[in-house]
From Swiss-Prot:
This is DNA integrity scanning protein DisA. ATP binds at G88, L106, T119, R120, H121, R122, S123. Disulfide bonds: none annotated. The lineage of its organism: Bacteria, Bacillati, Actinomycetota, Actinomycetes, Mycobacteriales. Residues 21-159 form the DAC domain. It is an enzyme of class 2 (transferase). The gene is disA. GO terms for biological process: DNA repair. Homooctamer. Its EC number is 2.7.7.85. It comes from the Bacteria.
Length: 366
């Protein structure tokens, strides 16, 4: 499940003012199987002719074009394939609706760094860095398609390869989801009966992050597969569930802060967890440290008390601002569970209807 996108020699070295013209994600969507441009690229690969294609015709591009001939004709897969039989580059409009030039010699600055060895790929990489627009190189000898964009080199893979990898990743994700559900249910019971320990919390956070990571890998394959990924998208959505909201809720419950944690503090903790490598993620002490809890082996069995966000999150239609009001007033889940309808309705902004709804919901959960 190793991604095929690799950084170029200097990923931050893009021409001024061009960084936001095109993105890797947006370009991959336009190169997905079944799109006109991908159809043309597949024809070129089968014909063993090679190609150099620039997606964009702004001033940055035209300033490095030499020779060839200019015209302005509608894009067609067969037309692009025929034009790519010539030695030079083909220039497309940014929306890939028209072919603007053909048989062009590209003259990007030779000072742009490149890790490529072949002439076509060196020119493609330097042109992408110089202009900030996506450039595609099709290898005549290796039958590969490489996209250069946003300072990255991304080799396109065959749909069958992507499908196999995505299906394998879905199997892994299904195992992660099963294990997450187990530790999640165990934590939920511990929260309701006031015997939560640090390791209970850490175990859930670890598995939520593992689920998120494998989901991101599948997202990349889904993006490249385009319409061929519909079934995978359905399975991915089912396995992912509401993982993002659940991750926020558990951090809100257990992050050590003065008072209830601010959104910025929650997102900072999630960001810190996402930056842990796979090996570091498996060490409970690293998660405990991010939460502000003692990162020692002995402290993992220490009791901790949830604020109540995770449990309130299980009650339909209870919004975050109501949760904040209740938790500010009662302090933790145990106090919330012992509160009466009258106690809840006395909180500013809650009212009797919400108080009854929340009390009934807590009763069902416990």
């Amino acid at each position: 499940m190793t991604p095929t996108t690799t950084p170029v020699s200097n990923p931050d070295a893009l021409a001024p003012g061009t960084q936001d013209v095109h993105t890797l994600k947006g370009t991959l969507q336009r190169l997905a199987p079944g799109t006109p441009l991908r159809d043309s690229l597949d024809r070129i690969v089968r014909g063993h002719t090679g190609a150099l294609i620039v997606i964009g015709d702004d001033e940055n591009v035209t300033s490095i074009c030499d020779g060839g001939f200019e015209f302005d004709v509608p894009f067609a897969a067969t037309r692009l394939r025929e034009l790519c039989k010539m030695d030079g580059a083909v220039i497309l409009s940014s929306d890939i609706e028209r072919i603007k030039r053909a048989n062009v010699q590209l003259l990007p600055s030779p000072t742009w760094p490149t890790q490529e060895s072949g002439t076509r790929h060196r020119s493609a990489e330097r042109t992408a860095l110089h202009t900030g627009v996506p450039v595609i190189a099709v290898s005549e000898s290796q039958n590969t398609i490489t996209l250069y964009v946003e300072g990255k080199a991304h080799m396109l893979e065959q749909p069958s390869t992507l499908l196999n990898r995505a299906n394998q990743a879905l199997g892994t994700m299904e195992r992660y989801r099963d294990r997450l559900d187990q530790v999640n249910n165990r934590l939920h019971l511990a929260e309701l009966h006031s015997y939560v320990t640090v390791i209970d919390v850490v175990s859930v956070i670890q598995r939520e992050e593992m689920l998120r990571r494998v989901g991101e890998i599948i997202d990349g394959d889904v993006l490249e597969l385009g319409k061929d990924a519909k079934q995978i998208q359905i399975q991915l959505s089912e396995l992912r569930g509401d993982n993002d909201r659940e991750r926020e809720s558990i951090i809100a419950d257990y992050l050590v802060t003065d008072g209830i944690p601010a959104d910025e503090e929650i997102y900072a903790a999630l960001e810190a967890i996402s930056h842990l490598d796979d090996k570091a993620l498996l060490k409970p002490a690293n998660i405990a440290r991010i939460l502000g809890l003692p990162p020692t082996e002995e402290a993992l069995d220490e009791p901790v008390a949830p604020r109540g966000y995770r449990t309130l999150n299980r009650i339909p239609r209870v919004q975050k601002f109501l949760m904040d009001k209740l938790i500010v007033e009662f302090g933790n889940l145990d106090a919330l569970l012992n509160a009466s309808v009258e106690d809840l309705s006395a909180v500013d902004g809650v009212g009797s209807l919400w108080a009854r709804h929340i009390t009934d919901g807590l009763g069902r959960l416990s």
